[in-house]
């Protein structure tokens, strides 16, 4: 299984809202992203759905600036739908 296929599988979450946001980023931005942003995305994919959802809603702020920056990017993509 290629890395992109594996990531696409991991984008399938328990919540439809998360499926959409994570898959949209993977399709639109992942391949052109920096290595640091790719690592941040993989970190987010390893998070539990409620924690990730809280970040995307702005209910929580992640203490790592690189990951928080990606969360803001994900929110921006979500709002463009």
Residue ranges and their predicted role:
Residues 2-81:
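Positively charged, polar, low-complexity stretches
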């Amino acid at each position: 299984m290629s890395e992109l296929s594996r990531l696409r599988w991991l984008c399938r979450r328990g919540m439809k809202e998360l499926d959409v946001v994570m898959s949209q980023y993977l399709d639109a931005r992942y391949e052109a992203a920096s290595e640091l942003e790719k690592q941040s995305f993989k970190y987010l994919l390893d998070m539990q759905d409620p924690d990730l959802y809280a970040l995307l809603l702005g209910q929580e702020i992640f203490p790592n600036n690189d990951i928080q920056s990606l969360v803001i990017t994900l929110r921006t993509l979500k709002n463009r739908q």
